[in-house]
């Protein structure tokens, strides 16, 4: 199963111009997540602090979002209420890397029209949806799991609902991760540009936020203005 971690790669342009098509510095009309993550693979757990810059159009409205049922909200700077009658079973995920979305809880939050700061939500818990390999072609993929944190590796995507999911709109994000001492040699991989030790960021609109982690060896090679990165899983 975790042979799927053997190779992860990214490619990025070096020193892009902010005037190039597709760049959206500080896009104000998209939800932006700023994630601080503590991972303990041995305990199959994570602790997350998410500071969200909300689109202006959301101010003064009641919002709903979903979060993995294995995670519990521990703090928020706006009142949040869980809808006890709206626990949603796992379902099909469109345009995702896996077939099924994790079971989630649904929450409600009222955002004042005068709200000018960032919505801050902290949460923690475990995610370990073990894959059942129904045929040989799944042996090296994550097609049968919505998300997993374990001593063998971490794979989280939109289907894991590990980040508050409001709707199907595009988002931007930055993240930084720290590991428990037992995984101190691990490395994270996500979209966008590396930002310090185990940090990633992108202002390009995304459909989801990946978080992949294991003990990798990192290789890079440049070809003109493009730098290719390969993350090989250590045996």
Language model features by range: what are they?
Residues 31-38, 104-110, 157-162:
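Short structured motifs
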Residues 47-70, 158-180:
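Surface-exposed beta-strand/loop patches in extracellular or lumenal glycoproteins
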Residues 122-216:
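Extended, low-hydrophobicity, Ser/Thr/Pro/Gly-biased non-transmembrane segments
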């Amino acid at each position: 199963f975790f042979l799927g971690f053997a190779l992860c790669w990214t490619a990025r342009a070096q020193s892009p111009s902010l005037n190039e098509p597709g760049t959206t510095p500080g896009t104000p009309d998209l939800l932006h997540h700023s994630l601080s993550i503590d991972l303990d693979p041995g305990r199959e757990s994570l602790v997350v602090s998410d500071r969200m810059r909300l689109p202006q159009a959301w101010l003064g409205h009641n919002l709903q979002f979903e979060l993995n049922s294995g995670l519990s909200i521990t703090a928020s700077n706006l009142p949040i209420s869980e809808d006890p009658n709206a626990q949603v079973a796992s379902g099909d995920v469109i345009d995702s890397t896996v077939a099924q979305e994790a079971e989630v809880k649904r929450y409600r939050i009222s955002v004042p029209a005068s709200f000018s700061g960032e919505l801050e939500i902290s949460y923690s818990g475990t995610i370990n949806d073990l894959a059942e390999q129904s045929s040989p072609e799944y042996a090296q993929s994550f097609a049968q799991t919505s998300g997993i944190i374990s001593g063998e590796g971490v794979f989280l995507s939109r289907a894991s609902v590990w980040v508050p999911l409001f709707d199907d709109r595009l988002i931007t994000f930055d993240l930084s991760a720290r590991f428990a001492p037992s995984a101190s040699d691990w490395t994270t991989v996500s979209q966008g540009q590396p930002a310090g030790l185990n940090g990633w960021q992108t202002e390009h609109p995304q459909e989801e936020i990946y978080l992949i982690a294991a003990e990798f060896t990192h290789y890079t090679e440049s070809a003109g203005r493009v730098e290719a990165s390969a993350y090989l899983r250590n045996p």
